């Protein structure tokens, strides 16, 4: 068994990087430690221009770069020096004048940055596929018993610290090896994804008219946390995150206190946070089992998130027990005190948490308190995945939203300004409610939420029952439906409950009947032309 603690000294290093962040300082430190440096192309020039002694690979191999730099390091003196097994291949290395290379610092051509540039064509993309780099990375990673491979600039400092202590341990080299294979796997996956979208039916292969979906789907996530169990205790689980999340979310949040997040905590917190991000004014979202059970926007600037919380909680005090609470403003002491003194809560998440609020929540040591940072108004395009037996459904993320200018009034009566504000509020909430979804709202507070029913009219009935149970009046409220009404009974029920305005996508074969039902009841109705199914 390999000794995990024995340190491997470094006498010779090969440095060839596209991203030169920190490389000059790294090379200087290696030189100060007596390490001989081999280098190539632009990296060699950078070192030479800054007084760092280095040997150009072409001088070492006796073989000049050729084919516009396509062939630089693909040489036995390079790969023999990397792959050579110490104590086994020494004689053959000596016979062929191959010197051992103990450390390889390489990162790859910026393929991702290249293909993301406007106007990038296929030949340009192809020229930015690195060949020599991944080959060296894989060689060094394979022979990690004798060679250290460094692909991340963030590891330079740790490597130098270890070298000053006598060398890198096997445990460190193993970790660097794993990072290297993860790096090349992500790189090759990115290339396969891109090439898999090229229009092969065109007379000339081009990236014009590219498919959104590659022939094989390659995506890499990094394990952030192993969990005690999954959705249920008999299931195992872990939480994986993107290497570069495109926007603030549960994956970027910092846990300030509390028990370890569970599988269900992560899923529910994501639902709550994504919903509250829909609102500009101070808002609160309370979620239970991935469904909003209470949502509110503070009706006045002075009320802040404390008032939003009070209104959201009032929607469904029973379901709020053991729920997830999300805010779109800093959690302040007053709001934190109101929460911990009133209810049992699993998770509280906000862009930031004041020191006073943090001290208050600390009295409830098990409460998971998260700060996620501020987010921009624009939602990032991304992919959503759903596992099915033997396959994976992939779709673009639902970031569609509408404003008042997008509403199509289809009834005789147009909604008032207040009704429009409430309709858009209810529509934003309905987007995050499991289908079939019905939301009653008034003054930008949810009055009743009907979720997950097989029949839309039953969701409407349940939302009304929930409102009555909470002591809230559906009369005078508005109603949002995540999809069209297939029959007029949905509108008839809305009229019976006292709803004054309705927002829905439209598009049913019976739209005319539904509109007639609204007109008969004097209900204002608008179509969005956009559906928000959520399964």
From Swiss-Prot:
CDD domains: IMPCH. Residues 6-151 form the MGS-like domain. Pfam families: AICARFT_IMPCHas, MGS. InterPro entries: AICAR_Tfase_dup_dom_sf (IPR024051), Cytidine_deaminase-like (IPR016193), MGS-like_dom (IPR011607), MGS-like_dom_sf (IPR036914), PurH-like (IPR002695). SMART domains: AICARFT_IMPCHas, MGS. SUPFAM superfamilies: Cytidine deaminase-like (SSF53927), Methylglyoxal synthase-like (SSF52335). Keywords: Hydrolase, Multifunctional enzyme, Purine biosynthesis, Transferase. Gene3D superfamilies: 3.40.140.20, Methylglyoxal synthase-like domain. One of its GO terms (molecular function) is IMP cyclohydrolase activity. GO terms for biological process: 'de novo' IMP biosynthetic process. The keyword Hydrolase applies. It catalyses: (6R)-10-formyltetrahydrofolate + 5-amino-1-(5-phospho-beta-D-ribosyl)imidazole-4-carboxamide = 5-formamido-1-(5-phospho-D-ribosyl)imidazole-4-carboxamide + (6S)-5,6,7,8-tetrahydrofolate; IMP + H2O = 5-formamido-1-(5-phospho-D-ribosyl)imidazole-4-carboxamide. One of its GO terms (cellular component) is cytosol. Its EC number is 2.1.2.3, 3.5.4.10. Pathway: Purine metabolism; IMP biosynthesis via de novo pathway; 5-formamido-1-(5-phospho-D-ribosyl)imidazole-4-carboxamide from 5-amino-1-(5-phospho-D-ribosyl)imidazole-4-carboxamide (10-formyl THF route): step 1/1; Purine metabolism; IMP biosynthesis via de novo pathway; IMP from 5-formamido-1-(5-phospho-D-ribosyl)imidazole-4-carboxamide: step 1/1. It comes from the Bacteria. PROSITE patterns: MGS. Belongs to the PurH family. The IMP cyclohydrolase activity resides in the N-terminal region. This is Bifunctional purine biosynthesis protein PurH. It comes from Pseudomonas fluorescens (strain SBW25).
């Amino acid at each position: 068994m390999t000794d995990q603690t024995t340190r491997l000294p470094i006498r010779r290093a090969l440095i060839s990087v596209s991203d030169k962040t920190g490389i000059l300082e790294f090379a200087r430190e290696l030189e100060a430690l007596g390490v001989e440096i081999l280098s190539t192309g632009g990296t060699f020039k950078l070192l030479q221009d800054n007084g760092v002694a280095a040997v150009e690979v072409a001088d070492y191999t006796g073989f000049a770069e050729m084919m516009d730099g396509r062939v630089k390091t693909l040489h036995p003196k390079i790969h023999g020096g990397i792959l050579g097994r110490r104590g086994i291949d020494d004689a053959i290395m000596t016979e062929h004048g191959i010197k051992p290379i103990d450390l390889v610092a390489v990162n790859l051509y910026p393929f991702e940055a290249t293909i993301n540039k406007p106007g990038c064509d296929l030949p340009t993309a192809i020229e930015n596929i690195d060949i020599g780099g991944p080959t060296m990375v894989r060689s060094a990673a394979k022979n990690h018993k004798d060679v250290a491979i460094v692909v991340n600039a963030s590891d330079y400092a740790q490597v130098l610290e270890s070298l000053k202590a006598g060398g890198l341990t096997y445990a460190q080299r193993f970790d660097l090896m794993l990072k290297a294979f993860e790096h090349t796997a992500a790189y090759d996956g990115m290339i396969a994804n891109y090439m898999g979208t090229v229009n092969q039916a065109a007379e000339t292969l081009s990236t014009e008219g590219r498919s959104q979906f590659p022939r094989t789907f390659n995506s890499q996530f990094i394990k952030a946390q192993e969990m005690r169990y999954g959705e249920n205790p008999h299931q195992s689980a872990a939480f994986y995150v993107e290497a570069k999340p495109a926007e603030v979310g549960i994956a970027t949040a910092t846990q300030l206190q509390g028990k370890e997040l569970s599988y269900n905590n992560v899923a529910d917190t994501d639902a709550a946070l994504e919903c509250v991000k829909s609102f500009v004014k101070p808002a609160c979202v309370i979620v239970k089992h991935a469904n909003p059970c209470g949502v509110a926007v503070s009706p006045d600037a002075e009320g802040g998130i404390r008032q939003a919380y009070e209104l959201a909680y009032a929607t469904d005090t029973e379901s709020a027990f053991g729920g997830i609470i999300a805010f779109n403003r800093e959690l302040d002491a007053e709001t934190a005190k109101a929460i911990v003194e009133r209810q049992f809560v699993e998770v509280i998440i906000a862009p930031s948490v004041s020191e006073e609020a943090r001290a208050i929540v600390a009295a409830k040591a098990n409460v998971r308190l998260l700060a996620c940072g501020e987010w921009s108004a624009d939602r990032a395009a991304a992919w959503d995945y759903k596992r099915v037996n033997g396959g994976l459904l992939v779709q673009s993320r639902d970031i569609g939203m509408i404003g008042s200018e997008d509403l199509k009034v289809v009834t005789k009566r147009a909604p008032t300004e207040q009704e429009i504000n409430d309709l858009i509020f209810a529509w934003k909430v309905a987007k995050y409610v499991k289908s079939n979804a019905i939301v009653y709202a008034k003054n930008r507070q949810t009055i009743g939420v009907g979720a997950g029913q097989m029949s839309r009219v039953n969701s409407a009935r349940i939302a009304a029952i929930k409102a009555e149970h909470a002591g809230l009046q559906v009369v005078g409220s508005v109603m949002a439906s995540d999809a069209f009404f297939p029959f007029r009974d949905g509108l008839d029920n809305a009229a019976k409950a006292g709803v004054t305005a309705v927002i829905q996508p439209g598009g049913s074969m019976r739209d005319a009947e539904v509109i007639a039902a609204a007109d008969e009841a004097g209900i204002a109705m608008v179509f969005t032309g956009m559906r928000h199914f959520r399964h």
